[in-house]
């Protein structure tokens, strides 16, 4: 009985990963990319402002 739950979780985990690789993961990746770009632009902006000052 103890050996069954890990196997079931493993199978469900693989299925969830496969689903996330599809349409479900696209918004997450897009949001992460947008946040990364915004943070990069913000850090660049702060650096430029400091240099000008």
Curated annotation (Swiss-Prot):
KW Glycosyltransferase (keyword) present: no
Recorded coiled-coil stretches: none
The name this protein goes by in its record: IgW transmembrane form Tm1T3/Tm6T3/Tm3C4
Naturally occurring in which organism (per UniProt): Ginglymostoma cirratum
Keyword terms of this UniProt record: Adaptive immunity, Immunity, Immunoglobulin, Membrane, Transmembrane, Transmembrane helix
Expression across tissues: Expressed in the spleen, pancreas, peripheral blood lymphocytes and at low levels in the epigonal organ.
GO BP field: adaptive immune response
Segments of this protein annotated with the region Disordered: 1-25
Domain of life assignment: Eukaryota
Locations listed in the record: Membrane
Main location: membrane
GO cellular component: immunoglobulin complex; membrane
Bilayer disposition of the protein: Multi-pass membrane protein
Biased composition (Acidic residues): 13-24
Residues that span the membrane, as ranges: 29-49
């Amino acid at each position: 009985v103890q050996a069954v739950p890990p196997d079931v979780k493993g199978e469900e985990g693989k299925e969830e990963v496969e689903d996330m690789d599809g349409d479900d993961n696209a918004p997450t990746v897009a949001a992460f990319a947008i946040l990364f770009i915004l943070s990069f632009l913000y850090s660049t902006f702060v650096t430029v402002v400091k240099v000008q000052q």
